[in-house]
């Protein structure tokens, strides 16, 4: 008993001693966490270089764009063929995807040989062989008459400019077919299929095996955004933000990048950690100086690395008592499968004995322990290096998402990861230490990369079909120049109807005379009050206008709110509230006393019989105060002043906000003869020749016409360009059937159009995973400011997602792109329609004056015009295209329509003293 214990103790001591000797001998292969973090940092830099246009040509890690832009979302379906070429055999699969109740994938496959004479022959021979095998497969499955979509897994480095094209950069593994490097493998395969002529195939996608792995796993777990292969070779791919990929146009969304990380170190960046054994292995390989990282990591080389170590240690008398056999000296006699067998927990030592005996050495027990430890060091180094490079990818994903902690899934395939008894456990453990702020789930690819190629094809098909349906819907919003010319022509017709006495009563565009007959001439002088009412808030202003050499306008104002109960109460209550606020303002300014002239900006449709009289036609914008419609608002204001008996006012002018805007700008720029508002609502006014204004007597001079163009189309004349979404928005509005042109343009409604399109797309499964959330059902959720923010060129998709999240909409990257597209299409149409309307106005002025060319300025106000990043540019462009004989300048109204009301009042006071203009 004691003898046995002593023997065991002696053996353990011997074993420990031998392990220490080997640790010392292979010290350079044992990498500390400090070194691994340094490698992680180096690889991160290499990735950045590969993505950069400037550094990519010389980068060793090529970071190849794959043009795979989306992982499966679970709605894919169809019948597909997958080809998988990249190893000793060639696999063809038929993959059927359906999701009637539970989504499932059924697969049938056949394996075909790729003999040495074919992989080392010509490219023509190779692709003829692939086409023959595909023909045989389709014959067996009785699908030769079907033109099924084909996904092609081609596991070699390729440069792609689209998903159905792949130009081979260089052969790897044992492939050497001539005439293929630098050629598009899809064209070569199509040529071979065409040559046979007995079947047809539609090659939709070419993918690398790593991408195939990611897509296979992505079908089961939509969090999967990394693919990893650790087998004969090694590689990884991941979903990168398009804005970081210089080699591909566009910055919206994501694209899968095939890193081709096997070449990491080919530029010398890993020389400090490569050992003499790595260098010897490289010298004897088919591609010296290439794929240096892969040669330190992958299954193709691991057994050979161990063999080289055994030979050197035996030569130095540290193993096998210095015995060296011909078998031990023969390359390929010690395989990675031997490494896996030797590292097994229980039978590892026994396996070592059998394998070493096969090599002709007669190993002692200590030799077997030593060889097991050598295998452990080599395979552990591999796991550590892969953990470092994968750690760099995870850090990059985390940084891209701007999140403190990353949760993601990595799809994995490869014999080394799957078959080696300790590899995956060691690899996961190291990764957790290197990237503690990432929670990573590893998902084993059960079906190989063929299913992945089919899934890429299925996703490409789904996206193409979705794209077709989305484009079909959005096409109704895309207006051709011909359509816009027609809108311009129709508005001209409506304008003529509104101006004529006999047709005015039937006209929808009312063309209301404003009795403003002159723009400021610079002689206006004095102190004026202005009242600006057009929404839930209103302003009272004191405007001090000074003429002379230095014309100045000094303004003081105070903003007051109108409670909802007053907006929707009685007319007396509304005007009493307004007068109460004026009283407060006069006290605030210390000017209560003298009777002051007042201009009243009243932004609702009014029929005017004089400058100081405006009969309200109808309330808009949520106002419902009773006993106002059909009454003169100036009289209602005067009556309320009398009831208060505190002060007196001289109501000189009732002005629409559009007219006020024109006058404000005309004070600065005398060529300003048009006013435009594009904000919550939209409207325009312009200086019309009196001879054309049949509703007012007199033919001399001009008068500003308040078009009230928001009602354009209320008679059905725009029904052919109104979409179903416009109709829904109109139906649920407060004034159904009214202001139809406004509802296609103004900020009050654009968000609603967008929301309804998003609901439609969500129902069809294109958005938000098909889930219509409560916020999306909420009317008014998309305010103009959100549309402006979402469409801003400066905003990355992450920020767009943040805005949508703020609105309670959890979106993916693809969702954000689609939302941005919808916003863009809706706002572009609004700008174009507004431009068509403005083109009609400027052409009318030009024709009125019989000019070959008109130079005119438009005074503009409104949040949509001011804040939206593209609206003004598109509108200006449309006006230019539709009215080429007019040069139109746009001047932003800085001081709102209140200043305009004061100026109109000043002009009115000036004209009172000029009897020639009555």
Swiss-Prot record:
Region (Hexokinase large subdomain 2): 656-895
Region feature Hexokinase small subdomain 2, mapped onto this chain: 521-655
EC number(s) stated in the UniProt entry for this protein: 2.7.1.1
Residue ranges, annotated region (Hexokinase small subdomain 1): 73-207
Assigned GO CC terms: caveola; cytosol; membrane raft; mitochondrial outer membrane; mitochondrion; protein-containing complex
Pathway(s) it belongs to: Carbohydrate metabolism; hexose metabolism; Carbohydrate degradation; glycolysis; D-glyceraldehyde 3-phosphate and glycerone phosphate from D-glucose: step 1/4
Positions annotated to bind D-glucose 6-phosphate 1: 84-88, 209, 232, 413-415, 449
UniProt-annotated binding residues for D-glucose 1: 155, 172-173, 208-209, 235, 260, 291-294
MF annotations from Gene Ontology: ATP binding; ATP hydrolysis activity; D-glucose binding; fructokinase activity; glucokinase activity; glucosamine kinase activity; hexokinase activity; identical protein binding
Keywords attached to this entry: Acetylation, Allosteric enzyme, ATP-binding, Cytoplasm, Glycolysis, Immunity, Inflammatory response, Innate immunity, Kinase, Membrane, Mitochondrion, Mitochondrion outer membrane, Nucleotide-binding, Phosphoprotein, Repeat, Transferase
Chain segments carrying region Mitochondrial-binding peptide (MBP): 1-10
N-acetylmethionine carried by residues: 1
Pfam families per the UniProt record, alphabetical: Hexokinase_1, Hexokinase_2
Annotated family: Belongs to the hexokinase family.
Subunit organization: Monomer. Interacts with RABL2/RABL2A; binds preferentially to GTP-bound RABL2. Interacts with VDAC1. The HK1-VDAC1 complex interacts with ATF2. Interacts (via N-terminal spermatogenic cell-specific region) with PFKM (via C-terminus). Interacts with SMAD5.
Free-text function comment from the UniProt entry: Catalyzes the phosphorylation of various hexoses, such as D-glucose, D-glucosamine, D-fructose, D-mannose and 2-deoxy-D-glucose, to hexose 6-phosphate (D-glucose 6-phosphate, D-glucosamine 6-phosphate, D-fructose 6-phosphate, D-mannose 6-phosphate and 2-deoxy-D-glucose 6-phosphate, respectively). Mediates the initial step of glycolysis by catalyzing phosphorylation of D-glucose to D-glucose 6-phosphate. Involved in innate immunity and inflammation by acting as a pattern recognition receptor for bacterial peptidoglycan.
This protein's name: Hexokinase-1
Source species: Rattus norvegicus
Gene behind this protein: Hk1
């Amino acid at each position: 008993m004691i003898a046995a214990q002593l023997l065991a103790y002696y053996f353990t001591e011997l074993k420990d001693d031998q392990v220490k000797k080997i640790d010392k001998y292979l010290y350079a292969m044992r990498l500390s966490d400090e070194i691994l973090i340094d490698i992680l940092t180096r690889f991160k830099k290499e990735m950045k270089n590969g993505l950069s246009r400037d550094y990519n040509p010389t980068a060793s890690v090529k970071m190849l764009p794959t043009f795979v832009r989306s992982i499966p979302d679970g709605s894919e379906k169809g019948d597909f063929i997958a080809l998988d070429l990249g190893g000793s055999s060639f696999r063809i699969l038929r993959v059927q995807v359906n999701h009637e109740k539970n989504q499932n994938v059924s697969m049938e496959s056949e394996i075909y040989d790729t003999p040495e004479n074919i992989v080392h022959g010509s490219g023509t021979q190779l692709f003829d062989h692939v086409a023959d095998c595909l023909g045989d497969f389709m014959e067996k499955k009785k699908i030769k008459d079907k033109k099924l979509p084909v996904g092609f897994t081609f596991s070699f480095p390729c440069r792609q400019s689209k998903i159905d094209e792949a130009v081979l950069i260089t052969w790897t593994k044992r492939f050497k077919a001539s005439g293929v490097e630098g050629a598009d493998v899809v064209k070569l395969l199509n040529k071979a299929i065409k040559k046979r002529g007995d079947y047809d195939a539609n090659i939709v996608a070419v993918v690398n095996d790593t991408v195939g792995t990611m897509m296979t796993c992505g079908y089961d777990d939509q969090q999967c955004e990394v693919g990893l292969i650790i087998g004969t070779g090694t590689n990884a791919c991941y979903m990168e933000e398009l804005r970081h990929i210089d080699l591909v146009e566009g910055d919206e969304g994501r694209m899968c990048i095939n890193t081709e990380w096997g070449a990491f170190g080919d530029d010398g960046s890993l020389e400090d950690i490569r050992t003499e054994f790595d260098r010897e292995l490289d010298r004897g390989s088919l591609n010296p100086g290439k794929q240096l990282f892969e040669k330190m990591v992958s299954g193709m080389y691991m057994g050979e690395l161990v063999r080289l170590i055994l030979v050197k240690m035996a030569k130095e008398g540290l193993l096998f008592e210095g015995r060296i056999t011909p078998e031990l000296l023969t390359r390929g006699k010690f395989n990675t499968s031997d490494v896996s067998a030797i590292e097994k927990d229980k039978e590892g030592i026994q396996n070592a004995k059998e394998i070493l005996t096969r090599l002709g050495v007669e190993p002692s027990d200590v030799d077997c322990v030593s060889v097991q430890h050598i295998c452990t060091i080599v395979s552990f180094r591999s796991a550590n290096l892969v953990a470092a490079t994968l750690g760099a990818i995870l850090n990059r994903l985390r940084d891209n998402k701007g999140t403190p902690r990353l949760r993601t899934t990595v799809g994995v395939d490869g014999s080394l990861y799957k078959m080696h008894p300790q590899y995956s456990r060691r690899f996961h453990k190291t990764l957790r230490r290197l990237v503690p702020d990432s929670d990573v789930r590893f998902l084993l690819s059960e079906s190989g990369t063929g299913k992945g190629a089919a899934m890429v094809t299925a996703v490409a098909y789904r996206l193409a079909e979705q794209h077709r349906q989305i484009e079909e819907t959005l096409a109704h919003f895309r207006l051709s120049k011909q359509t816009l010319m027609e809108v311009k022509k129709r508005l001209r017709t409506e304008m003529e109807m509104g101006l004529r006495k006999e047709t005015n009563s039937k006209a929808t565009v009312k063309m209301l005379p404003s009795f403003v007959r002159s723009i400021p001439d610079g002689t206006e002088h004095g102190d004026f009050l202005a009242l600006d009412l057009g929404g839930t808030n209103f302003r009272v202003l004191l405007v001090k206008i000074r003429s002379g050499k230095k014309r100045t306008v000094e303004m003081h104002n105070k903003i007051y709110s109108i409670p909802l109960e007053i907006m929707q109460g009685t007319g007396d209550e509304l005007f009493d509230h307004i007068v109460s606020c004026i009283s407060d303002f006069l006290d605030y300014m210390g000017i209560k006393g003298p009777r002051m002239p007042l201009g009243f900006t009243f932004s609702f449709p009014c029929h005017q019989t004089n400058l100081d009289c405006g009969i309200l036609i109808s309330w808009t914008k949520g106002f419902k105060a009773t006993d106002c419609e059909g009454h003169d608002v100036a009289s209602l204001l005067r009556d309320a002043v009398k009831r208060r008996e505190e002060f007196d006012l001289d109501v000189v002018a009732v002005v629409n906000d559009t007219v006020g805007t024109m006058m404000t700008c005309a004070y600065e720029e005398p060529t300003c003869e048009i006013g435009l508002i594009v904000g919550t609502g939209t409207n325009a006014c312009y200086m019309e020749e009196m001879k054309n204004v049949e509703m007012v007597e007199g033919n001399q001079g001009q008068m500003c016409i308040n078009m009230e163009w928001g009602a354009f189309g209320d008679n059905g004349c725009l029904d052919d360009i109104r979409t179903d979404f416009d109709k829904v928005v109109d139906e649920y509005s407060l004034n159904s059937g009214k202001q139809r042109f406004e509802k296609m343009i103004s900020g009050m409604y654009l968000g609603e159009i967008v929301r309804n399109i998003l609901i439609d797309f969500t129902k069809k499964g294109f958005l938000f995973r098909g889930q219509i959330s409560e916020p999306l059902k909420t009317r008014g959720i998309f305010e103009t400011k959100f549309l402006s923010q979402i469409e801003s060129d400066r905003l990355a998709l992450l920020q767009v997602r943040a805005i949508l999240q703020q609105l309670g909409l959890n979106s993916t990257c693809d969702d954000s792109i689609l939302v941005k597209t919808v916003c863009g299409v809706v706002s572009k149409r609004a700008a174009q329609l507004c431009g068509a309307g403005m083109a009609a106005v400027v052409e009318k002025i030009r024709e009125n004056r019989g000019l070959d060319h008109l130079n005119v300025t438009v005074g503009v106000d409104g949040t949509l015009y001011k804040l939206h990043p593209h609206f003004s540019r598109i509108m200006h462009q449309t006006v230019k295209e539709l009215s080429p004989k007019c040069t139109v300048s746009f001047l932003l109204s800085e001081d709102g329509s209140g200043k305009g009301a004061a100026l109109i009042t000043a002009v009115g006071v000036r004209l009172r003293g000029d009897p020639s203009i009555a």
